[in-house]
Swiss-Prot record:
The gene is tmk. Phosphorylation of dTMP to form dTDP in both de novo and salvage pathways of dTTP synthesis. This is Thymidylate kinase. It comes from the Bacteria. Signal peptide: none annotated. One of its GO terms (biological process) is dUDP biosynthetic process.
Amino acid sequence: MITGKLITVEGPDGAGKTTVLEQLIPPLKQKVAQEILTTREPGGVAISEYIRELILDINHTTMDPKTELLLYIAARRQHLVEKVLPALEAGQLVFIDRFIDSSVAYQGAGRGLIKADIQWLNEFATDGLEPDLTLYFDVPSEIGLARINANQQREVNRLDLETIEIHQRVRKGYLALAKEHPKRIVTIDATKPLKEVVSVALEHVLALLLA
């Protein structure tokens, strides 16, 4: 039985969501008694991390969109069973850096795959598990890509090679999801200073936990 809460973190490339999540956890731990787990997709467990390497390998530029989607789904299932569900059943507060919405935005809006097919596959893989809250960090594609290019410490992966048009479609996909699920998805302006973005995210998380 699930007694914990699931919060997912989403955003287009360059939104800074991973950095925000890292800075969100310390102040959150000072305010809540629950044990907190942070993890990521694809990855989080050994099998899923191996799949992540396959997906992001810069040499795999011929990867078919459906192959890409199925690899993400496989990684998601293993991660869920091995790590996420046990934590939720133990009453933990679980943060996942990317989840189902990423598939809809990237493989759906970005790659042009049918949304209904993506949703069915995710329903199958997750047994219908849905986040209690999704923090969507929004940033225009031009700004996101500029941030990526300016970060010399970041290792380039296959997805960084995509055209700006695909990144723009991904963002539109995210914005459509936020409009479709206004109660679950909170849109946060990620162009603001980092400290402000973290503060807004913390407010929304606490609102969920104290409701």
